[in-house]
Amino acid sequence: MTTTVETATATGRVARVIGPVVDVEFPVDAMPEIYNALHVEVADPAKEGELKTLTLEVAQHLGDGLVRTISMQPTDGLIRQAPVTDTGAAISVPVGDFTKGKVFNTLGEVLNVDEQYTGERWPIHRKAPNFDELESKTEMFETGVKVIDLLTPYVKGGKIGLFGGAGVGKTVLIQEMIYRVANNHDGVSVFAGVGERTREGNDLIDEMSESGVIDKTALVFGQMDEPPGTRLRVALAGLTMAEYFRDVQKQDVLFFIDNIFRFTQAGSEVSTLLGRMPSAVGYQPNLADEMGLLQERITSTRGHSITSMQAIYVPADDLTDPAPATTFAHLDATTVLSRPISEKGIYPAVDPLDSTSRILDPRYIAAEHYNAAMRVKNILQKYKDLQDIIAILGIDELGEEDKLVVHRARRVERFLSQNTHVAKQFTGVDGSDVPLDESIAAFNAICDGEYDHFPEQAFFMCGGIEDLKNNAKELGVS
């Protein structure tokens, strides 16, 4: 499975340059294969008198020895008739322990240290695992976060969509998952920044360094200011690193993509540059195929998994837009982060009613778990239905039964909050891990009214039942 860049197989000449699209002429009997990486030397505008190497990826064979390529870097300074070398292999990236704590670009170049890598590399274009290699059983991925494990359980080797605007705790939740995979599951994480703002990427690296999770994480960035070819391939580069950890090191991997919409957007730009006829809403005609090539590689093989969390931007909040709609078809769970919930100071600010999971079903989880989740959802839904009446008439106008629903729902809502490990640097409070069995027992007890006499404040930002009792004790309740 080891792959290194082969020696040059042929030399061609630049025939045409149109922005990131470069047409290259080769001898008819030495045409490079689709997805092969080509190298061309060009004057480096940053260093006078020096040359830099541009990487081009073959996208189309036009015939008569002509190939159309997409450049992975800006083509400023590239001239016609410049010699182009076929590397004989696809773009490849470093794999293995070397990648942990490092920041890479799409081409596998290290960005945060000067250390050069001479070890094993894998090509970014790889086949999905064969059907007989896939893990057949559906297993829950326990995180220790109450609201996720109880109401929107994640699938080991599944794909989770993460919805949330700015400032609702998306980055903290991502970092917390990286921390928990490293410490609770002895796993590793890979983060692919697809079309990330440079500032966002820089902030993420700084925050991960401060919270101590960066040494268990490989980061790959294709920034917003880079050509579409780079932004289209960066997710594949990150996924290739994740596949090595899964297949060779036999680890459970958490793979983050931020933002999957920008992957689609980059594909649309490349499709237009290649002259393809646009499809619905101007997207590329091969949208579903392109998404499938990425998503089908994110899966569990026998005993080991890649679990993916994908941040999803929804254009104009239109869920029927082809980009998010195509992504939804692949998701096993959706975690919606809500601004109104974060404004109450409840973190993680997961919306318990909007968030869903494929395995929140008695066929996949214990009946006790399913029943507890349904009780919590029902009580929160009733509380939501009563909000308008409370806003207009006040809580005193409700019947006794409705008052009891509101009383317990407010406690349930606050008990869904939890301190995270990575936020300790801001809060000074240790994070908590709550086993699923304890979460189920706790929420059943709250819904049964066992803790009706505890004040609401006692339920806020605590872990399990012991934390709840300690909080109540501090507030003077026995």
From Swiss-Prot:
Question: Which residues are the signal sequence here?
Answer: none
Q: Which keywords are on file for this protein? A: ATP synthesis, ATP-binding, Cell membrane, CF(1), Hydrogen ion transport, Ion transport, Membrane, Nucleotide-binding, Translocase, Transport
Give, as one word, the top-level EC class: translocase
Subcellular localization, as worded in the UniProt entry: Cell membrane
Q: How does it sit in the membrane?
A: Peripheral membrane protein
A GO cellular component entry from the record: plasma membrane
Residues recorded as binding ATP, renumbered to this chain, are 164-171
Catalysed reaction(s)? ATP + H2O + 4 H(+)(in) = ADP + phosphate + 5 H(+)(out)
Coiled-coil intervals in this record? none
Report the EC code(s) recorded for this entry.
Answer: 7.1.2.2
Q: State the Gene Ontology terms under molecular function.
A: ATP binding; ATP hydrolysis activity; proton-transporting ATP synthase activity, rotational mechanism
Q: Tell me the protein family, please.
A: Belongs to the ATPase alpha/beta chains family.
Q: How does it assemble?
A: F-type ATPases have 2 components, CF(1) - the catalytic core - and CF(0) - the membrane proton channel. CF(1) has five subunits: alpha(3), beta(3), gamma(1), delta(1), epsilon(1). CF(0) has three main subunits: a(1), b(2) and c(9-12). The alpha and beta chains form an alternating ring which encloses part of the gamma chain. CF(1) is attached to CF(0) by a central stalk formed by the gamma and epsilon chains, while a peripheral stalk is formed by the delta and b chains.
* Biological role stated in the UniProt entry: Produces ATP from ADP in the presence of a proton gradient across the membrane. The catalytic sites are hosted primarily by the beta subunits.
Q: What protein is this chain from?
A: ATP synthase subunit beta
Q: Which organism is it from?
A: Streptomyces coelicolor (strain ATCC BAA-471 / A3(2) / M145)
